[in-house]
């Protein structure tokens, strides 16, 4: 919400189970060899489960194991002196940063390399807003479309379409349109007297200027590349910076945004 500082509070509830003491009869049971055998079998089953190799696990078991392993990972902020204990998460990385001060309130593996996928488009939008104008024209070249594969996020834009930068950013952020993100980068780069690669260079330089040290961006839409990576801390710094742009906040407040067919030609 513009003009207001937003604070997200995580409330941890601790529930105590209390058993009240009430009068009851005392019952003694004879030792049960069957029960002992069942207990031994259960213990053996538990040991077997623990020793089960990953290659023998089903996809569901592998997913569950990955979640459990992630949950057990260290939360760095829990070791800070006089700092509240944060909750566990099933994600391998997590961060909470105060957008006003940049203070980190919660940290879990925040410098670990991760593939950013479509959140790359947040940085793409930041560079577009920094170097472009919302009224600029964005023309879709063959390069903006040719890499698209079936199933890729798209707004259905075609080669030769011409829309405004504002419309292209709506498509990039609301529809996560990969062709729109590419077109934004290509056109903003050209309007600055350069090209798409210059735009990617600005993405990396901007990240470093904000204090990012563990990122490398090679495209504007986040489609997978082994050399395209970031970390939670760097993305939080990028998010904090773009929070200063009211145009970005306006776009993010919308649930849908129509682009008239007449505007694409």
Give each language-model segment a name.
Residues 4-16:
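Sec-dependent N-terminal signal peptides
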Residues 17, 134-135, 178, 213, ...:
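A general structural signal for well-ordered secondary-structure junctions
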Residues 234, 239-265:
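Extracytoplasmic
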Residues 30-35, 41, 45-233, 237, ...:
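Active-site-adjacent loops and short helices of periplasmic peptidoglycan-processing enzymes
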Residues 19-35:
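Sec-dependent signal peptide cleavage junction
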């Amino acid at each position: 919400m513009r003009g207001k500082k937003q604070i997200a509070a995580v409330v941890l509830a601790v529930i105590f189970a209390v058993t009240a003491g009430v009068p009851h009869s005392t019952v003694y049971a004879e030792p049960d060899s069957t029960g002992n055998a069942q207990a031994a079998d259960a213990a053996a089953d538990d040991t077997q489960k623990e020793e089960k190799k990953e290659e023998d696990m089903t996809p569901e078991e592998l997913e569950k194991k990955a979640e459990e392993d992630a949950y057990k990972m260290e939360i760095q902020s829990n070791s800070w002196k006089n700092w509240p204990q944060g909750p566990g998460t099933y994600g391998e990385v997590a961060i909470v940063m105060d957008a006003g001060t940049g203070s980190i309130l919660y940290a879990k593996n925040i410098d670990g390399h991760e593939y950013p996928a479509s959140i790359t488009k947040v940085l793409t939008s930041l560079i577009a807003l920094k170097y472009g104008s919302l009224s600029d024209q964005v023309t879709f070249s063959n390069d903006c479309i040719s890499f698209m594969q079936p199933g890729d996020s798209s707004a259905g834009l075609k080669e030769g379409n011409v829309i405004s930068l504002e419309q292209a950013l709506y498509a990039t952020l609301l529809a996560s349109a990969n062709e729109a993100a590419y077109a934004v980068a290509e056109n903003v780069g050209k309007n600055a007297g350069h090209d798409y690669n210059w735009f990617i260079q600005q993405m990396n330089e901007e990240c470093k200027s904000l204090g990012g040290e563990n990122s490398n961006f090679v495209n504007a839409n986040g489609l997978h590349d082994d050399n395209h990576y970031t970390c939670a801390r760097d993305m939080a710094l990028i998010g904090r910076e773009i929070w200063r742009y009211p145009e970005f906040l306006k776009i993010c407040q919308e649930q849908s945004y129509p682009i008239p067919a007449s505007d694409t030609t």
